């Protein structure tokens, strides 16, 4: 890759009086900041959200986990081989996260947008907490003299010294020459470090924990070794096409993201997609009265609203409180905005822009009203399609004077569009033939999704649409709680799905039921639309934990929150938090393929092979084939399996095609934090042993 001054990354000044104050002029790098944090305006909201997530949500204190029992077991239960491995692994893990802290610090010195620098600082702090956690484990379990020896192992153990150099050299080269090529290489190095280089050590700790040994050490590792948090198979996400199953998402799909600060919905392209195998605990929140439910992996965050204050926050699904003043939002307010970004441009300074589409509509047109009536009470005459006359004929019949008067009012409003019509009196009502010009841009159809574009409408348009809809194909019942509620019914699943999507964008809760007639081809879908409610109360909900084995899915968006639907139940939920550097790599490969030259792609594959071999040798060296439950063969196959998994997750072919199964499947379940219940008011983890904790 050509090295030019344009590709060099420059460190910012500590204080720059001539810098730009305006948020619109901020750049991730190569900007001109004063370097004074002025956060009254935020340009990169995704970074500020990430800062708050890492700084305040995903946090624990190592001292909260008592290590006394582990100290006793280290002295009396562990074999000499287990002690040696325990010490070597901790020494190595301390080094790895020490490198991470400095690597992020070097990045931060060149970042020129304050909110982005804060996010990097938060991640740097998390890595320092990891390093401190390893140190806390070490000094809690072994005596001070021995702990000092373990810190110094890298000077005495040549294998450990070489291990420390592997990733460190990539980071050092980036520091020496901070250009695009070295950025990609450092990114790959970071990805390998986080997703591969910890794992033989983690496998050793989990093997001990599986035998009931050093369980508090293992609990610390579980907090560090968190995985993606996802939705169960069958969950859908709201896109510009409507609700789409995660399995059917296209690369060009824009999804609805929710701003927790404003309650507004905008469209954006996901910057990460997750599809993976999962085996372990799932949680279901269910509202029996309305048949509303949602299912997600343990730890997946949902938006929770305090009904007294109106404030919203994120809580893991297993910790959502079920009481009268707690609610889960199920809809937002779409204002016509699209959040656009290019991840490489984020790094090079162009950032995220929020644009309002000029084509958005605030009011229904007469033609749109006519199409709503067509869906409810009309038919399209397929034989009189206007091939020779230029007019498609539509047929209507009404017996109620209310509908007759309203329909003729709409027809008169449609006259400027070239609509013509005739009416015929019948014994039981009035029939109409409407002549619909073929040259109108909107074609007559019985399906809403063929003429409504979700990105071209606003909340005002949606509410007017719903008002018009229930005039023709529904009614306004009297709710016992005196809430404003509409009722709509249809036999068309497409229309049911689309109305739910509209209501989710228009700030309205929906409840769906199905009534199947044995004599009818299709069931009748009944939708109750609560115009004044955009949430569902948790008071009468039921929370269930159950075992699940199968696929899970999710996406990641800049705002961190998405609109999902499961079994016709809509809600706002947090998206998954996935490996940052994996997302950077994947997005760069799509948006900036020129950076991934054949030479760079060859280097990535070869470096992955090298890293896998180094991790295998390290794991075998540490365990010496003397640890019950894990041996050299298992380590080799496990690390090769992870190597295949990690490299395919960034778009490359498996490097070990002969390895297709995870030989240590039990780790994926064992490492979940589902046997630790944390009381956040007391901030003290309480661990409850489960019967399956020692299963083999």
UniProtKB/Swiss-Prot annotation:
Active site: 134
Cofactor remark: Binds 2 iron ions per subunit.
Protein's job: Provides the precursors necessary for DNA synthesis. Catalyzes the biosynthesis of deoxyribonucleotides from the corresponding ribonucleotides.
Residues that bind Fe cation 2: 127, 194, 228, 577
Substrates-to-products reaction catalysed: a 2'-deoxyribonucleoside 5'-diphosphate + [thioredoxin]-disulfide + H2O = a ribonucleoside 5'-diphosphate + [thioredoxin]-dithiol
Name of the gene encoding the protein in the UniProt record: nrdB
Any one Pfam family match given in the protein's UniProt record, by short name: Ribonuc_red_sm
EC assignment: 1.17.4.1
Cofactor dependence: Fe cation
Post-translational modification, as annotated: This protein undergoes a protein self splicing that involves a post-translational excision of the intervening region (intein) followed by peptide ligation.
GO term, biological process aspect, one: intron homing
Record-given protein name: Ribonucleoside-diphosphate reductase subunit beta
Binding site residues for Fe cation 1: 97, 127, 130
Quaternary state and interactors: Tetramer of two alpha and two beta subunits.
Organism from which the protein derives: Aquifex aeolicus (strain VF5)
Alphabetized UniProt keyword annotations: Autocatalytic cleavage, Deoxyribonucleotide synthesis, Endonuclease, Hydrolase, Intron homing, Iron, Metal-binding, Nuclease, Oxidoreductase, Protein splicing
PANTHER family reported in the protein's UniProt record: RIBONUCLEOSIDE-DIPHOSPHATE REDUCTASE SMALL CHAIN, RIBONUCLEOSIDE-DIPHOSPHATE REDUCTASE SUBUNIT M2
InterPro entries with a match to the protein in the record: Ferritin-like_SF, Hint_dom_N, Hint_dom_sf, Intein_C, Intein_endonuc_central, Intein_N, RNR-like, RNR_small
UniProt record similarity statement: Belongs to the ribonucleoside diphosphate reductase small chain family.
Residues in DOD-type homing endonuclease domain copies: 377-507
GO molecular function annotations of the record: endonuclease activity; metal ion binding; ribonucleoside-diphosphate reductase activity, thioredoxin disulfide as acceptor
